Structure formats: structure tokens, C-alpha cells
Amino acid sequence: MQNSPWFVEFSDVWLAYNDELLKQNHFAVEAIDLKVRQGEFIAIVGPSGCGKSTFMKLTTGLKMPSKGRILIDQQPVTGPLKISGMAFQAPSLLPWRTTVDNVLLPLEIVEPYRSSFKAKRKEYEERARKLLQKVGLGGYEDKFPWQLSGGMQQRASICRALIHEPKMLLLDEPFGALDAFTREELWCILRDLWTEQQFNVILVTHDLRESVFLADTVYVMSKSPGRFVVKREIDIPRPRDLEVTYTQAFGDIVHELRGHIGAMRKTTLSAPAVAPA
């Protein structure tokens, strides 16, 4: 991975949510510089409201920066990306569609799949069923969301995000509402999918254990206006089993990250930097 090309590049990126805030130099995120290798798994942690979700919107092209440049897969971001998939804390499955039909939804609405969906329905459905089997939902493909547990719904949500075989998966607190045991099961499922397919992953989470277990690199964001203040490479060898979370090395990294975030909570926010003209 060290010799892989850069897949995500942020160069001095600033975002104000409207022109009035821009005139006041009031930014949601500021001075973001980031380079992520192709196939890398990164996690972003930080206090609530620090700009983590804003960063995700910039990465997917849902928001354009006020200043700076963003490249994804060596191409400028000029609008919503088709090469990315997203999953959130709420699975948001459509209640009138079966599990497999929920997973297929992106293929029905996103080109180039949309125009060929009817002709290739059987092929796409086979892909969806295989993906559901990989995440442990074999036998539940034709169930409705109300027949699935929260963990099962989140597995289906991840499958939906991956059905169009994106180059990048963005996860915004995907396991935050789940119990500890289910959460750890899904860590392992995500780990296995990433290991097999080697897409890029950007994970936003408040769970430091989750970030250290899954990521190659963890970034800590400051309080708003958000900027990256710590980059911590996770030097725990892969493949990682859950037993690694009980080791001294793992615990030390978690405590180190917690210390960075705790220090930010104790300090008074300094005045935001002024963006370059």
C-alpha cells in the first residue's frame, strides 16, 4: 500500500456553509490537508460537532469547498461521486421492500446500472444475494426490514452501499446504535469485506476501540472549526482478530487517542485561523 497512488487528496480545504459565513471567516472545517493511499482504511474521531460529517460531504461531492482543492481517484471533485457508497447510523431501509430489493435500490437509480437494470435484473440480484450471504444474511434475503434485528438491518445497509462495487466506502457512525456484541460482529464483517475487496474506507466514529481495530490510520479532528490535529498510524499487524483488543499495545493506542480528545475538551478554543485570500 505504501507504493499505491494517492486516492484521496485534500489540499488546504476550507468550507463555510454560506456566503455570509464566508465573509465573516466562519468555517465549519479549515485548512484540511489529507492524503490517503489507494486501498487504505482510515478513521476520523473527534468531539461532537467538530466537522466529521462535513468532511464526509466534501469527500463525496455533496458539498463544494469554499477554498482549496479535492481530488478523488486523481480526479477533481465537481459534484456527487458515483464511485462511492455510504452507510449511516440509521439503516434507513425502505419498509415495503424486501432485504434483497433494498440492497438493489442503488442499481435502480444510478447510472450506468439504471438503464440496464431490467435486462440484467437476474445478474444483479445474484450479486446482491451473494453479498448478503457474506455478511451472514443468507436466508433473510426475502424478509422485510421489520423482520430483521438492528444488527441485521445494518448489515443490509452496508450491502446496499457496496452493491455497485464502489471504489470508496464512507461510514458515518454505522454501528453507534448497536449493542457491544453486535457491534464487534460487524467490525469483523467489515474487516473481511475490506480485506477481500480492498476498496478505500473512511469511517467516522466516536468509538476509539472501533477506530483502532479497523483502521490503518486514525485522524483526530479539533473542535469546530474542524481541522486534523493528530495523525496516528496503527502499527498493529493484520489480520486483526478481536483478541487483539485485549492486548497492551491496543490499549495504549486507545488511551493515547483518548488523551488527545480529552485535552481538546479541557482547552478553550483558540480563535479560528483566517483563510488565505
Regions found by a protein language model. Give the residues of each.
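The feature captures the beta-strand-to-loop junction immediately N-terminal to the Walker
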Residues: 45-47
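Helix-to-loop junction immediately C-terminal to a conserved catalytic motif
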Residues: 60
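Conserved ABC transporter NBD signature motif
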Residues: 68-79
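Conserved ABC ATPase "signature" region
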Residues: 104, 108-111, 116-140, 192
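Conserved ABC ATPase signature
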Residues: 144-148, 152
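A short, proline-enriched helix->beta-strand linker immediately N-terminal to the Walker B motif
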Residues: 163-167
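Catalytic Walker B motif of ABC-type/P-loop ATPase nucleotide-binding domains
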Residues: 169-172
